[in-house]
Amino acid sequence: MKKDELRYLQRLAEIYPTIGKASTEIINLQSILNLPKGTEHFMSDLHGEYQAFSHVLRNGSGAVRKKIDDVFGHTLSNNDKRSLATLIYYPKEKMDLVKDTEEDMENWYKITLYRLIEICKTTASKYTRSKVRKALPADYAYVIEELITEKAEVLDKEAYYDSIVNTIIEIGSAENFIIALAELIQRLVVDHLHILGDIYDRGPAPHFIMDRLMQYHSLDIQWGNHDVVWMGAAAGQKACIATVVRNSIRYGNLDILEDGYGINMLPLATFVMEAYKDDPCEIFAMKGAFNYNVLEEELGKKMHKAIAVIQFKLEGKLVRRHKEFQMEDRALLHRINPEKGTITLPDGKEYPLRDNNFPTIDWKHPYELTAGEKEVMDKLSSAFRNCEKLQNHIRLLLDKGGLYTVYNGNLLFHGSIPLNEDGTFREVQIYGKSYKGKELYDVLETYVRRAFYSVGKEEQKKGRDIMWYIWAAPNSPLFGKSKMSTFERYFIEDPSTHEEKKNAYYRLWENEEVVDNMLREFGLDPEKGHIINGHVPVHQSEGESPVKCDGKVIVIDGGFSKPYQKVTGIAGYTLIYNSYGLNLTAHEPFTSKAD
């Protein structure tokens, strides 16, 4: 017997010290395998859109409505089914509406309770009693268990259940009980949640999404590039901090930082009022419709430009320090000719700048922060590192997340696997060593975790810097484009300079041989496995399908980000995997709970 096998057996002997206990566990596990498969729910690219995320989470991407159809078939009208589904999604709000129109609330309570009990029975039937018991709300656990469990010893079951329901109504607990049942159905309908990245980005409330996920009963997270840049910021990586702040200002979401995480923007605001007082910063207007007055808009533009310039300085120093990143083409400030107001890009072409006012750049040392910029970044770094709420949210990403997940025979990740044009795995240099395929994912994730857990300062620093690399590098599995053209989009009019060419993965995901090789690389059976990933919006309005390679690759960019919805034509896709198989759901843009 091998040493490892013996070690596992010794550990099992500690957990199950007798034949009886081991036998009981084997019987229990085998019985669970014979139950219907628990429903998995896949969501991706939430982009801070909490309201839309919450709605999809409540309805389980149609799983709740499907369960209503299973239970009631043709015995309920479509209107009644819709009304019941809405009640399960938003029980309190729906009951407030019903009370305005319903004349006999007692009768409505009774009918509704019985309907919810029937749905609870069906949703609970695919789980063990132990698992259902753990899901029950503490205040009503005993009563709900009585109502959804068949009691063979009770001869007159109808009278028994009637007495319980009538008592619930008589003592004035009907509304609270309905809310408890609705929330239980929401929980039981989805057994496990997969979030395939980009919880953070341009939307207004990623912190609310993280709060909700911290309470969720069973989930895993595949980090997106926007998640990793926030993780880098939380670890104190200054280029990541500047990126996060710039994105928040650009999309008018400083509330995330100031109200959501208590990160003070006053040092930056104070700095720009002096350093950029004579600069109108016209090309740095915020995107979207905001209720800002003229003074707030002017201040926002100055803050936007100031943090963008700081970001470009920090990134320039970073790529020059890490030659192995092979990203020196992203150091652009030294290529500016301030007298001519032009820039010569790495390809040798010269372009006029849309804005040639750089009051904080010393052209002899263009990547050095001024004393004022350094003070701003030191204060921001301290604020990010010492924000307890942010650190708790990042801890959830570390505890429940990773760069990829293998689950129930499927490979889940956010972006793309770096490939050569011939479909072979691209070798990528990470701190002096070459990695490819699964090994590349594993080493990058190891470095990310070292940023938070390593006791060595040098390893921590490498981990912090690798998070910026994962955010922006062409060879990063989470970015996967030729360059991140942030500078060009701000300062150069010519759209050809804005192009970000995608990794070969996106040109080869219809090639079955390449897809099979990727599945095998991660230990999966190509005949049964699937690749499920997000990151790239599916342009349904142009006829694009989210299903690639005869169903072996499924793209579920959630499309929660409102700007993308104008391009894609829908609010993206989510995926359900249950005992019936894989089911894609296309979503209409979410407007409001009232609608």
Language model: regions and residue ranges:
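Feature recognizes metal-dependent phosphohydrolase scaffolds
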Residues: 1-595
